[in-house]
Every structure is written in structure tokens, then in C-alpha cells.
């Protein structure tokens, strides 16, 4: 009985989150976001640009200049201040790996055009891990390296539970498009 209540509470939290702020982010990716800062050192400099890829229900930054939530906890500006050419991918947070991967390919091509480089380093968090692996498999010539941070390479119990529920599948199919 307690497990059923926990599942219902989780579903309510997910639906509430989606309907109170993430809906616009879920509907479409806005394109790659370059992080620019004044260079303080070059300890984080890499040969190729870095593209950071968020996980399921993720974002790059939400809010405005006076109040915002940064998915990457200010790591990207620190990397930029210290020599990295770094971009934050902005993908549909509630969609398939293939769908997100195709969005990421477009953004990687944008990064290549902006920087004039022929490859990128991809870093993916959570669902971003399988997403960057998809890109590496489909467009290996674009990729210098692939790194997963807490990647969901063997699936996710939470995702399995949500997908096994018809009501949640219906909600995510509607919102995820």
C-alpha cells in the first residue's frame, strides 16, 4: 500500500512540475547556448569545444537575470573563465534518446560552425549520457570524446515505473511532443 502511495506521489510531483514551468522547455529545444566569460586562466582549455548535455527533465538555465536556476551549478561559467569553449545543449527534456540525439546533432553542427573546429567533446549527465552516445554512434566524425556523468546506460527504475503506467505515458506523449 505504501509503495502505491509513493508512486502516486511521484506521479503527482512529475505532473505538477511539468505543468508549472517546464512545459515550454519540453515542447522544443531552443538551440545551443554558448557560455562566455572573461578568461582568467587556461587550465581548462581543450583542443575542441565542450558541449554539455542535460538529463531527463533538464534545462540549461531557467529564470531571468535576477533569479534563475542553473542546471550545471555555475560549472560552465567557471570552465569558460578558465579557457574552455563551452556550450550548453538545450534539448527536449522529456523525449526519447533518439529524438534528443537528433536535436543534439543539429546543435553540435551549430557549435562546429560557430567555432570553426571539426570535432567536439560531449559530456552528458543522466539521460544526457545515452544522448551523447547516440550522437557518437550516428556522427562519429564530429566527436573527439564522449563522457557520461551519472548516465542512465542501463535504464532507470523511475522511468520504467512511469512508462508502465498508462496515464503517465499518455501525459508524457502529449507533453513531450
Outline where the language-model segments fall.
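Bacterial N-terminal signal peptides that target proteins for export
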Residues: 2-11
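Hydrophobic helical h-region of N-terminal Sec-dependent signal peptides
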Residues: 12-16
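Cleaved targeting-peptide boundary
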Residues: 26-36
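Extracellular, luminal, or virion-exposed ectodomains of exported proteins
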Residues: 36-41, 45, 158
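Active-site catalytic motif of lipid deacylating hydrolases and related acyltransferases
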Residues: 42-120, 168
Amino acid at each position: 500500500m505504501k509503495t502505491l502511495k509513493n508512486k502516486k506521489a511521484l506521479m503527482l510531483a512529475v505532473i505538477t512540475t511539468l505543468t508549472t514551468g517546464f512545459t515550454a522547455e519540453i515542447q522544443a529545444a531552443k538551440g545551443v547556448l554558448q557560455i562566455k566569460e572573461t578568461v582568467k586562466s587556461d587550465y581548462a582549455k581543450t583542443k575542441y569545444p565542450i558541449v554539455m548535455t542535460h538529463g531527463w527533465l533538464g534545462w540549461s538555465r531557467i529564470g531571468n537575470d535576477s533569479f534563475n536556476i542553473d542546471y550545471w551549478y555555475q560549472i560552465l561559467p567557471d570552465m569558460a573563465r578558465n579557457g574552455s569553449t563551452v556550450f550548453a545543449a538545450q534539448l527536449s527534456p522529456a523525449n526519447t534518446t533518439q529524438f534528443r540525439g537528433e536535436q543534439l546533432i543539429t546543435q553540435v553542427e551549430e557549435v562546429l560552425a560557430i567555432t570553426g573546429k571539426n570535432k567536439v567533446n560531449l559530456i552528458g549527465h543522466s539521460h544526457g549520457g545515452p544522448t551523447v552516445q547516440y550522437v557518437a554512434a550516428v556522427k562519429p566524425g564530429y566527436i573527439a570524446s564522449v563522457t557520461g556523468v551519472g548516465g542512465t546506460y542501463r535504464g532507470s527504475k523511475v522511468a520504467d515505473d512511469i512508462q508502465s503506467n498508462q496515464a503517465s505515458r499518455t501525459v508524457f506523449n502529449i507533453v513531450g511532443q
